[in-house]
Amino acid sequence: VNQYAMPPRLESRLRTIKFAHYLQKAGYEVTIFASSIMHNMDIDLIEDDSLYIERQYGDLNFVHIKTAKYKGNGLKRVIGLIQFPRRFLKIAEKFPAPDCIIQTATVPFGNIIYRYARKVKVKYIVEVLDLWPETFVDLGILNKKNPIVPLLYKFEKWLYTKADQVVFSMEGGRDYIIDKKWDTDHGGPIDLKKVFYINNGVDLADFNHFKEQFKLQDASLEDESVKKVIYLGSIRLANNLKKLIDAAALLKEHKDVVFFLYGDGDDRKDLQK
């Protein structure tokens, strides 16, 4: 269950669909429940009032659930975050009962899916790709003094506590729980034995294909006389590209150092100025 999972032709965050692909190759039957709204795109896969649609993309089985269309991080996105788990509960019984639910955490909106997992008595695994609300606090989007912040941390702690297993996509997940004193050694409810780290990894079949088929022709990249600093990824607030650009400005007199930034995102136009 990942609200933001997309069909392969649109997806840039490949973790969910790659996991599904290789789980199926290993003999598991996988269904991905996702929103009909494609994040950061003006696309709704459901053009009528249907509550959901089923689609198959190669070996990937998707159920797209209708949610509010939005741009940016305003009220409509919050409405969509509330709608998705509630509508998932409405349609879940139309499908065969699962043996396991893997949910990409969206604290606190996704916590309701735990109730369904317990109702059908299946293993419930929480996958953590972003720290909610820690990321928003670190970026200054939410102030620690905001009364909603302690509540969000409480929901996050509850979700990790209730999960049968917690899988972080980044290193330091266990340390994060320890720092919060949520682990059993600090009197908290979370057993660190159920906390794991699995990074996004690389699909070598894709990598080997792309490196042959999509070669970037740039003489500067081939220049062995200069040191290259290369960034490849989204250009958004969370990745703090301004710091890298400021570093490039400090080194602009060093002609033997060249910075390459490849990507796109909300901050690109402002940073180009």
Task: Outline where the language-model segments fall.
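A conserved catalytic-core segment of Leloir-type glycosyltransferases
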Residues: 32-95
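N-terminal subdomain of nucleotide-sugar transferases
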Residues: 1-58, 171, 246-251
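An aromatic- and histidine-rich active-site surface loop
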Residues: 8, 78-89, 98-122, 126-135
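Conserved donor-binding/catalytic core segment of Leloir-type glycosyltransferases
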Residues: 220-239, 245-248, 260
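Acceptor-binding helix/loop patch of EC 2.4 sugar-transfer enzymes
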Residues: 3, 68-76, 95, 120-157, ...
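Membrane-proximal helix-turn-helix segments that form the acceptor-binding/catalytic region
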Residues: 89-90, 111-120, 146-166
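Carbohydrate-associated surface elements
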Residues: 36, 169-172, 198-201
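Acidic anion/phosphate-binding donor-loop and adjacent secondary structure
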Residues: 178-197, 201-218, 240
